[in-house]
């Protein structure tokens, strides 16, 4: 792991993340539990894996809220990671994939600053409604995969990163479009704060692996996943509307709270082959490099092992 020194620049004010689209597309939450005989079923909101972790990351509904100082350090760490990635990888005349979530806000702000300062010619491809609005609000050039199917660089956040740079993504409900953009990029760079760095998936992130499904298939998909791999499935429910979260693609999100370490490449392939599954929040062997903003103001960089 390479440690980058702290930035000395005094950063300006950062825009807060945009709310999810109407209907709760980016909202998280609990939901209906679909356990089956022989599966390991626990109440919604309870950590399914990594019990005993002292992480302050969100995920366990019964955990004590972290102190404000911890949260401010996490937000500053996101800013550090986002700016480091932009400084090291964004160049003139690139087509950029812009991720979704709270961390990407800081990267987009720095991209906009560099465009103004250096007169960069950049084209931005969004991964969600939120990303599209960020691009427009910061005066960047918006495009899509129809016009620019080849992306030079994609930058996005993650809910958790393991030792092999496998990711869990989709806490904000944008996993399918995020995976499409990352998969069409020559380079995929991830930015995150110190809370997202884990040895194994599930050590820090306790909300499970998101699975986007066609609405009519959410019950059979839930049963099939738990029968094959154990754990418990929850249909993600919206916060500001009655009913489930609806993605930007008009689908539902299942959160699979697994109860043990798996061979994630095999699991990802098996789940995506289930009829009704659109995609999963497992990003396997996709990230080239991850920047972690740390509590001490430094940035740790990890590259994909070979």
Swiss-Prot record:
- Phosphoserine-modified residues are 102
Q: Which UniProt keywords apply?
A: Isomerase, Phosphoprotein
Q: Which SUPFAM superfamilies match?
A: D-ribose-5-phosphate isomerase (RpiA), lid domain, NagB/RpiA/CoA transferase-like
Concerning InterPro entries, the annotation shows: NagB/RpiA_transferase-like (IPR037171), Ribose5P_isomerase_typA_subgr (IPR020672), Ribose5P_isomerase_type_A (IPR004788)
Q: Name one GO biological process term.
A: D-ribose metabolic process
Q: Where is the composition biased (Polar residues)?
A: 51-61
Q: Among its keywords, does the record have Cell inner membrane?
A: no
Q: Which NCBIfam families match?
A: PRK00702.1 (NF001924), rpiA (TIGR00021)
Q: What is this protein called?
A: Ribose-5-phosphate isomerase
């Amino acid at each position: 792991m390479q440690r980058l020194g702290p930035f000395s620049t005094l950063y300006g004010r950062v825009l807060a993340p945009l709310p999810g689209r109407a209907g709760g597309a980016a909202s998280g939450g609990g939901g209906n539990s679909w356990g089956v005989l022989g599966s390991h079923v626990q109440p919604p909101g309870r950590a399914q894996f990594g019990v005993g972790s002292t992480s302050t990351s969100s995920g366990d509904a019964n955990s004590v809220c972290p102190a404000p100082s911890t949260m401010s350090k996490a937000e500053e760490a996101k800013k550090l990671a986002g700016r480091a990635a932009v400084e090291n990888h964004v160049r003139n005349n690139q087509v950029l994939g812009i991720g979704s979530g709270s961390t990407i806000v800081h990267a987009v702000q720095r991209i906009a600053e560099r465009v103004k300062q250096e007169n960069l010619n950049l084209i931005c491809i969004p991964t969600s409604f939120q990303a599209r609005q960020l691009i427009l609000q910061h005066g960047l050039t918006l495009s899509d995969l129809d016009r620019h199917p080849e992306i030079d660089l994609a930058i996005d956040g993650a809910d958790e990163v393991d030792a092999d740079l496998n990711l869990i993504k989709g806490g904000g409900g944008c996993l399918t479009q995020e995976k499409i953009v990352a998969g069409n990029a020559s380079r995929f760079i991830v930015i995150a704060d110190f809370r997202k760095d884990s040895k194994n998936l599930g050590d820090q992130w306790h909300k499970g692996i998101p699975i986007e499904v066609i609405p009519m298939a959410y019950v059979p998909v839930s049963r099939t996943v738990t029968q094959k791999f154990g754990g418990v499935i929850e249909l993600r429910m919206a916060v500001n509307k009655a009913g489930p979260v609806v993605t930007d693609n008009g689908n539902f999100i299942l959160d699979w709270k697994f109860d043990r370490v798996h061979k994630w490449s095999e699991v990802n392939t098996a789940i995506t082959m289930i009829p009704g599954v659109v995609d999963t929040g497992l990003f396997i062997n996709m990230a080239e490099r991850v920047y972690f903003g740390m509590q001490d103001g430094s940035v740790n960089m990890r590259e994909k092992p070979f």
